[in-house]
Design a protein with these regions (language model features):
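Hydrophobic structural segments
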Residues: 2-299
Length: 299
C-alpha cells in the first residue's frame, strides 16, 4: 500500500488552502512567534533520540492531515483523531493534534481511496477551515522504554506495582482473585462496562498477560499466564482458540476491552511528556472515549 505517496498527495491538496492561513496567530496569544507543527515534531524527535528512540521509516507515523507549517497555538494528544476530538481540540484552542491511531479509519490511512467519501471530505474541510494539523505517533511511541501505552494502562488499573516491565510477555502478578473479580476490577478502574470475558468466572487468577489485538500476540500471554488481557481481538481467532483450549482441560481465560480502553491512557502520558518540550505552548490530553455502548438487558 502506497501510504507515503498518499500522505504527500494529501498534504499537497490541503497545502494551498492552509498556506493562506500562515498568518493564523503566528504572533500567538503571547505576541511572539510560535513554532510550526513541523518544528514541534522535530523537538519531539530530538527528545525521543535522547531516550534511545531513533526516528526511522514507519508506515504509520507522520502528518496525516493539514499543513506541517501551521503555526501551533496549542497541542492536544489523543488516542484517535476522531471528528469529535478535532472539534473539542478546536474549542480548547489546540490546533495541533497528536494522535496514536489513524485519522482516516484504516490503520494505514489510505487517503487516495477515500477522497470522495463525504465523511473524509468533511474531516479534511474542517481541518482546512480551522487551520489544524494532525500528526500520528504510533510505532515510535511504542518503542519507548517502558512502552508508555501499556505502562499507562497499568497506572490506570492501579496495578503498576504488579506489572513486569522487563520480561516477555508483559504481565501482572496480582493478589489471587477470580476471573470475575479481575473483570470487575478492570471495569471499575477504566470506567467502562465494555468488558468481555471468556472462561470460567471462578477461575483463580494470579498472572495476567498484557497483549495487543491479534492471536499471535495473545498466545504467548495465554501460555505463560492464567489470563490474557487484550484490547480488541478477532473473536473468530482468539475466543475460539480459547474455547478449544478449555475443551482440552486447560484452565485459561481472556478479558477483552476496547482498543481505546487499552491505549487511551498512554496518550494521557504523552501530554505530560510533551509539556517540558514545548513549555511556551499549552498541551492537553483529550480522551477519545469508548466507540460503543453495551445497553443493559431489560425484561
Amino acid at each position: 500500500m502506497q501510504t507515503g505517496v498518499s500522505r504527500r498527495r494529501f498534504v499537497q491538496s490541503a497545502g494551498t488552502a492552509l498556506a493562506a492561513a500562515a498568518s493564523f496567530s503566528r504572533a500567538g496569544a503571547w505576541g511572539r512567534s510560535n513554532p510550526t507543527a513541523a518544528e514541534v515534531v522535530e523537538l519531539i524527535k530530538k527528545k525521543l533520540a535522547v531516550e534511545g528512540v531513533i526516528w526511522g521509516p514507519s508506515a504509520f507515523d507522520g502528518f496525516h492531515l493539514g499543513d506541517p507549517n501551521t503555526p501551533v497555538i496549542g497541542v492536544a494528544t489523543t488516542f484517535e483523531s476522531t471528528f469529535d476530538v478535532l472539534k473539542r481540540a478546536l474549542a480548547a484552542k489546540k490546533n495541533f493534534v497528536i494522535t496514536h491511531e489513524s485519522t482516516f479509519w484504516d490503520g494505514f490511512d489510505p487517503v487516495e481511496v477515500m477522497l470522495h467519501d463525504p465523511v473524509c471530505q468533511a474531516k479534511i474541510r474542517f481541518a482546512e477551515e480551522n487551520h489544524m494539523a494532525v500528526w500520528r505517533i504510533h510505532d515510535h511511541w511504542h518503542r519507548r522504554k517502558p512502552d508508555p501505552i501499556f505502562a499507562g494502562l497499568a497506572r490506570k488499573l492501579e496495578w503498576t506495582s504488579y506489572y513486569s516491565l522487563d520480561t516477555r510477555p508483559r504481565h501482572y502478578e496480582i493478589p489471587e482473585m477470580s476471573l470475575e473479580e479481575v473483570a470487575r476490577h478492570i471495569q471499575s478502574k477504566l470506567g467502562t462496562r465494555n468488558v468481555v470475558v471468556v472462561g470460567d468466572p471462578g477461575l483463580r487468577v494470579k498472572t495476567i498477560g498484557d497483549c495487543a489485538h491479534i492471536l499471535s500476540s495473545v498466545l504467548p500471554a495465554l501460555r505463560a499466564c492464567d489470563v490474557a488481557l487484550v484490547g480488541e481481538t478477532p473473536e473468530y481467532a482468539t475466543f475460539e482458540y480459547l474455547r478449544d483450549a478449555m475443551a482440552l482441560g486447560m484452565k485459561k481465560g481472556v478479558v477483552m476491552i476496547s482498543h481505546e480502553a487499552l491505549e487511551e491512557w498512554g496518550m494521557e502520558t504523552c501530554a505530560e511528556w510533551l509539556k517540558p518540550i514545548v513549555p511556551e505552548i499549552p498541551v492537553e490530553w483529550i480522551p477519545t472515549g469508548d466507540p460503543f455502548q453495551v445497553p443493559p438487558i431489560r425484561g
